[in-house]
Amino acid sequence: MLTYETWEENVVSFSEEDETKGALSVLNWAYKEYKDEVVYACSFGVEGMVLLHIINQVNPSAKVVFLDTNVHFQETYELIRKVRERFPSLNIIEKQPELTLDEQAKLHGEKLWESNPNLCCKIRKILPLEKSLVVEKAWISGLRREQSETRKHTKFINQDHRFQSIKVCPLIHWTWKEVWRYVYKHSLPYNPLHDVGYPSIGCEKCTLPVGDGGDSRDGRWAGKVKTECGLHYQ
């Protein structure tokens, strides 16, 4: 089994000559390699809808973890309900932070997402995923190379130093148009915020719509140097 400790580059290759541009091949490998020791960390963005559809074909009882920061858009929570109806056998786990928002405010002050967004992300996203991955050998992410400069070198299979795990990224070669084409073709549910200028959807406090021609990540932590929550540190 390929693990963080036994990491080797290019130990497996994948065919990209199908509708999924390698994603189906990658996921078949991941569930064969790790069985029930792999989890998909899903933010329920539009890429997530594509991955959930393909994962459901490969492993209908797959584990899916959603990092519920308690400050997501209401539209995101409603989408999760629809996904549960569409894919009832998937094991969707809503992972909560240890601190409630009130407890966080007492310890670190009100609106931590404004005063120290890195700490807020650590408390509400990074630490919960870290705890989820303690019992897993690998995790799946919907990163695409096209999304931003920080993601353009992502590979199908990555040695993840942040969580000392294997990170599987099946959608690296997909374009934004291909993601949407797949969603429409398969009549998949998606977050309606995508229709009003939100290409990337995170917490409500830290996500704004993006103007025409903007980077898909421009609406995240707008006005701050920060462009990543920290889950995908390389």
Swiss-Prot record:
Residue ranges crossing the lipid bilayer per the database entry: none
Listed GO biological process terms: cysteine biosynthetic process; hydrogen sulfide biosynthetic process; sulfate assimilation, phosphoadenylyl sulfate reduction by phosphoadenylyl-sulfate reductase (thioredoxin)
Catalytically driven reaction(s): [thioredoxin]-disulfide + sulfite + AMP + 2 H(+) = adenosine 5'-phosphosulfate + [thioredoxin]-dithiol
Entry EC no(s): 1.8.4.10
Active site residues of this protein: 229 (nucleophile)
UniProt GO molecular function: 4 iron, 4 sulfur cluster binding; adenylyl-sulfate reductase (thioredoxin) activity; metal ion binding; phosphoadenylyl-sulfate reductase (thioredoxin) activity
Subcellular location(s) of the protein: Cytoplasm
InterPro entries: APS_reductase, PAPS/APS_Rdtase, PAPS_reduct_dom, Rossmann-like_a/b/a_fold
CDD domains, per the entry: PAPS_reductase
Binding site for [4Fe-4S] cluster: 120-121, 203, 206
Record keywords, A-Z: Cytoplasm, Iron, Iron-sulfur, Metal-binding, Oxidoreductase
Gene Ontology CC, one term: cytoplasm
Co-factor binding comment: Binds 1 [4Fe-4S] cluster per subunit.
PANTHER family in UniProt: PHOSPHOADENOSINE PHOSPHOSULFATE REDUCTASE (PTHR46509:SF1)
Function of the protein: Catalyzes the formation of sulfite from adenosine 5'-phosphosulfate (APS) using thioredoxin as an electron donor.
NCBIfam families assigned: APS_reductase, cysH, PRK02090.1
Family, as annotated: Belongs to the PAPS reductase family. CysH subfamily.
Protein name: Adenosine 5'-phosphosulfate reductase
Organism (species): Bacillus cereus (strain ATCC 14579 / DSM 31 / CCUG 7414 / JCM 2152 / NBRC 15305 / NCIMB 9373 / NCTC 2599 / NRRL B-3711)
Lineage, top ranks: Bacteria, Bacillati, Bacillota, Bacilli, Bacillales
